[in-house]
């Protein structure tokens, strides 16, 4: 990154994340609550009506991947976001932001994308679009 932009980012990121943080946290918690709850509901509903479908297991796999988003990287993400809001380390917020972006990229490909694929395959399977 251009040093001029780095200096600006180090100044602007902490207040931006302080303002965005609570709203963004609500969005993330809400979306993962919906993913986990709907995945579990679809798994349990199929069981209650006696359907033994492959889709049920895809729903559970999606739930597991969605839960991994929070369980594996949740504390690290919260710590990095706190560092960004606090201007750490030593006013070099872009260092913390870079770490958060790298962690987020890894998490997106390791668990978020597989969760999304599992939920899509589950839905298509239950609708008999695929076997």
Tell me what each language-model feature is.
Residues 1-33, 86-97:
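Interfacial loop at the N-terminal end of multi-pass membrane proteins
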Residues 25-28, 95-114:
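Individual transmembrane alpha-helices with interfacial aromatic-anchor signatures
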Residues 120-131:
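Juxtamembrane boundary at the C-terminal end of a transmembrane helix
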Residues 32-49, 75-78:
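Membrane-helix exit/interface motif
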Residues 48-67:
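Interfacial segments of alpha-helical transmembrane regions
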Residues 30-37, 41, 61-64, 68, ...:
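Lipid-exposed faces of alpha-helical membrane segments in multi-pass integral membrane proteins
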Residues 1, 67-88:
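Inner-leaflet juxtamembrane helices
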């Amino acid at each position: 990154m251009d040093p001029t932009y780095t200096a600006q980012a180090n100044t602007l990121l902490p207040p931006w994340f302080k303002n965005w943080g609570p709203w963004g946290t609500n969005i993330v918690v809400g979306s993962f609550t919906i993913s986990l709850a709907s995945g579990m509901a679809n798994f349990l509903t199929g069981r209650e009506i006696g359907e033994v479908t492959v889709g049920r297991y895809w729903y559970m796999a999606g739930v597991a991947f969605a839960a991994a988003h929070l369980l594996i990287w949740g504390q690290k993400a919260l710590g990095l976001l706190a560092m960004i809001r606090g201007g750490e380390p030593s006013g070099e917020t872009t260092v913390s932001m870079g770490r958060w972006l790298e962690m987020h990229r890894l998490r997106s490909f390791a668990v978020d994308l597989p969760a999304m694929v599992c939920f899509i395959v589950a839905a298509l399977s239950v609708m008999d679009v695929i076997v």
